[in-house]
């Protein structure tokens, strides 16, 4: 069976995912993309990914699955229409879901259309553990994001920090996951994913650190409850095309697509 998969956005993550799908002969796919600029299409995907004109064009193409990888604004513009039309979605820009009103609208749209929303793990691990303790009022979750200067180069000047002279680590934010995800939409999707899987946007605590000595994009997750403790530390290689995100993210999205299409899954 050939699956029809449409992307919203065709940046670094979506391009890597599309290439992975096209290379998988065991799971043939037809691909299309809704993108603002046809020049975004990498040469390796030219002629292999159909370009769609707006949401009407996407709906007319009738995909089996829609993968959003274009940022939080794209979710506000397109997700509700896709879900109402009955199209299952994978949402990569999880930070948008920190907005309770938007999240409620998307869930209502999915219910109306009989669609499902999936959020990939992305750059992190341990979501199954967080889901297991989600209902406990006595659970504590702390997440630390520690990334090198390259991941924050565009934002640091606006915070009064010179990225070229920064020699020591600096804490950029300390507070609840909701505020972190909405304040830093290009860097903190992970915070929203953790909070949605676990104890919520308010109780999940987030520390954001820029560190010129960081070995890649580092993620530390600590969970404590009477059920036990979990500590996870990941050191992910940055994406060659976008240092704000981990190279692992595209593979996580690809794995989520394969689970969505599979008859047999684990986890």
Curated annotation (Swiss-Prot):
The protein's UniProt keywords, in alphabetical order, are: NAD, NADP, Oxidoreductase, Pyridine nucleotide biosynthesis
Q: Which reaction does it catalyse?
A: L-aspartate + NADP(+) + H2O = oxaloacetate + NH4(+) + NADPH + H(+); L-aspartate + NAD(+) + H2O = oxaloacetate + NH4(+) + NADH + H(+)
For the protein in the UniProt heading, the enzyme class is: oxidoreductase
Active site, per annotation:
219
| GO MF annotations in UniProt | aspartate dehydrogenase activity; NAD binding; NADP binding; oxidoreductase activity, acting on the CH-NH2 group of donors, NAD or NADP as acceptor
- Extra information: The iminoaspartate product is unstable in aqueous solution and can decompose to oxaloacetate and ammonia.
Q: Which HAMAP family match?
A: NadX
Q: What is this protein called?
A: L-aspartate dehydrogenase 2
Native species of this protein? Bordetella parapertussis (strain 12822 / ATCC BAA-587 / NCTC 13253)
